[in-house]
Design a protein with these regions (language model features):
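Short linker/helix segments within small regulatory modules
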Residues: 218-229
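Short cysteine-rich clusters marking metal-coordination/redox-active sites
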Residues: 203-208, 232-235
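Cys/His-rich microdomains that often coordinate metals
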Residues: 209-213, 236-239
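Conserved RNase H-like, two-metal-ion catalytic cores of nucleic-acid enzymes
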Residues: 1-77
Length: 245
């Protein structure tokens, strides 16, 4: 299973606001007030087994032209079996789809997804679920300070270079958080079972593929079959299979 860790960076939205009450304006947003719609500034990704992420971005002279970014991301997303990101289900994939359909690109086939923000909210009670906080709390790396987005829109090459570095560091941080949280994620998508040369199923962790595990307990089912629970010695996650006699 090919697992892709990814992150995108987008511009803000520029609006012309004329209102007597700001809360009413926000509630009854009129798209006619859009002076500049958002677009994608860059994207970074890496396969789970890779050491370094890749990145693509707009150019300083055309900071609002994200066609090449979307095309590159469209290709790599199409190669993945599972997507991993922080808030990727609500932000990254929807932002990508919006720009993809803008350019009349075909949809990427549905993927398995692990959103580390959802995992953090479901299984824990962290004081904050922001990626920067999780990195500090879990002691697994760091998240850089955000770039000056306006400078990038103004064509600043130095700030664009920093954004590319920032984008890659987000992917590295997401990978570290994912690996730390994975063993607690009981509904994590499972890798297909591994078989040896004679076709017998090998008891490898379906989450991290670590080859060593311990038997925890077995339990009978109403159907008369039995299930065996294992714990991985690598990621310490649990999984259950049919009892092998």
């Amino acid at each position: 299973m090919k697992k892709l860790i990814w992150d995108v960076e987008t511009t803000d939205l520029e609006l012309l606001i004329r209102t007597y009450q700001l809360k009413n304006y926000i509630k009854y947003f009129d798209p006619k007030t859009i002076r500049r719609d958002w677009s994608m500034l860059g994207a970074s990704w890496m396969w789970l087994d890779d050491d370094k992420p890749k990145v693509i971005s707009v150019t300083p002279d055309k900071p609002l032209d994200d066609y090449e970014v979307i095309c590159a991301l469209h290709k790599v997303l199409g190669e993945a079996d599972m997507l991993i990101g922080h808030n990727c289900d609500q932000f990254d994939i929807k932002k990508f789809n919006t720009r993809a359909i803008f350019y009349d690109l075909p949809p990427v086939a549905p993927k398995l997804s692990v959103d580390t923000l959802k995992v953090a909210r479901k299984y824990f009670k962290f004081t904050s679920n922001k990626l920067s906080y999780l990195c500090d709390f879990l002691k697994v790396g760091f998240k850089d300070d955000s770039p000056d987005w306006q400078k990038i829109l103004d064509g600043c090459q130095k700030e664009l270079r920093y954004m590319r570095k920032y984008n890659k560091q987000d992917v590295i941080a997401t990978k570290a958080v994912y690996l730390k949280l994975m063993s607690y994620h009981h509904t994590h998508p499972k890798n297909p079972p591994t078989r040896d040369i004679v076709g017998e199923i090998v008891n490898i962790c379906p989450k991290c593929r670590y080859p060593e595990s311990i038997k925890v307990r077995s339990r009978p089912l109403a159907s008369g079959r039995a299930r065996q629970q294992y714990q991985c010695k690598g990621c310490f996650g649990y999984w259950t299979t049919d009892l092998i006699k």
